Design a protein with these regions (language model features):
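Generic structural signal for small/hydrophobic residues in well-ordered secondary structure
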Residues: 2-5, 12, 33, 49-51, ...
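Short, strongly hydrophobic transmembrane alpha-helices
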Residues: 5-35
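Membrane-embedded glycan transfer/ligation machinery
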Residues: 11, 46, 112, 116
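Membrane-proximal extracellular/periplasmic loop immediately following the first transmembrane helix
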Residues: 26-99, 105, 216-220
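Short aromatic/basic micro-patch
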Residues: 68, 108, 112-113, 144-145
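The feature marks short, hydrophobic/small-residue-biased sequence motifs that occur predominantly
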Residues: 91, 101-133, 137-138
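Mid-to-C-terminal secondary-structure elements
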Residues: 115-132, 142-278
Length: 281
């Protein structure tokens, strides 16, 4: 066939090769988005809550608000769960400026504010030091875990000698408590160059302010199951907690819109009010 019609034969071969390449790319993208790799090794047993819907108990009052998870919701609906291995909440990633104490070395980097549960859910490679603890979160201790790249940029080293040194994060002093290997941006939920504790006092303050009964917030919740076989049990426990929580509210109620989600469901949940049509695996 190649001799009889070389032009069409070449087109056919190239078309077949292109189709195979496209399929391979799609498979690779799927693997990156859904399969576990360090530090997100536990994707297959992690559940996620991105946001909540807030409505009036009296439907005649109308209106619906969508928000990231509030501290009160996280505290009463998720941190009280008995089945999971770990629960964590984190503020959305943001950019910040990190500088040395003499201000001569600096780096603009991505920052995540989170808690001690974060380090149980994700499998970071620590080069030196250790993650911050629950006591650091509760006491508002200014301690940071930084990436290898950030350590090299600020100190020129990424070893034990950096632990206990001071850096400035958005002009506030933090003590370096740990150094981890650099994280790929493809690990979307774990990726940053600096991780610091959120202040429990800030969470409590926002709960007590006029934020729709403390329901509005800026957090996302991660739940690590002991195995994927516990997913249904965890979801049932969450539903029970939400029902109990709604009964305690005066005028409002929350709806998790079928959350918590699996890794794939969370990726496909593009809009707050649209539940992804993905069968449970």
């Amino acid at each position: 066939m190649l001799k009889e019609s070389p032009f069409f034969s070449v087109i056919t071969i190239l078309g077949t090769a292109l189709a195979i390449c496209m399929i391979m790319v799609m498979v690779i993208v799927f693997e990156i988005q859904n399969k576990g790799f360090k530090p997100e090794l536990n994707r297959d047993r992690t559940l996620y809550v991105k946001d909540v819907a807030i409505t009036h108990k009296n439907e005649e009052d109308g209106g619906m608000n969508y928000s990231l998870v509030g501290g009160r919701v996280a505290k009463e609906c998720f941190f009280t769960l008995k089945t999971p291995e770990a629960v964590s909440m984190q503020l959305m990633r943001m950019q910040t400026l990190v500088t040395s104490t003499d201000q001569t070395r600096r780096m603009k980097c991505d920052q995540i504010r989170t808690d001690e549960g974060f380090w149980k859910i994700f499998d970071f490679e620590f080069l030196a030091g250790k993650p911050f603890l629950r006591s650091d979160v509760e006491s508002n201790i200014k301690k940071a875990v930084i990436s290898r790249r950030l350590a090299l940029r600020i100190f020129g080293l990424a070893d034990e000698s950096v632990i206990g040194q001071t850096i400035f994060v958005a002009r506030r002093p933090y003590v370096v408590g740990g150094i981890v290997e650099d994280v790929s941006p493809l690990a979307n939920r774990a990726y940053a160059q600096i991780w610091i504790p959120y202040a429990q006092s800030d969470v409590d303050r926002l709960i007590n302010e006029e934020t729709l009964e403390g329901l509005i917030g800026s957090y996302r919740v991660l739940i690590l199951a002991r195995s994927s076989g516990d997913f249904n049990k965890i979801k049932t426990e969450v539903e029970q907690n939400v029902a109990r929580f709604n009964n305690s509210l005066q005028e409002l109620k929350i709806d998790l819109m079928k959350q918590p989600d699996t890794q794939m469901e969370s990726r496909l949940r593009l809009w707050s009010n649209v539940v992804p049509d993905v069968p449970r695996m």
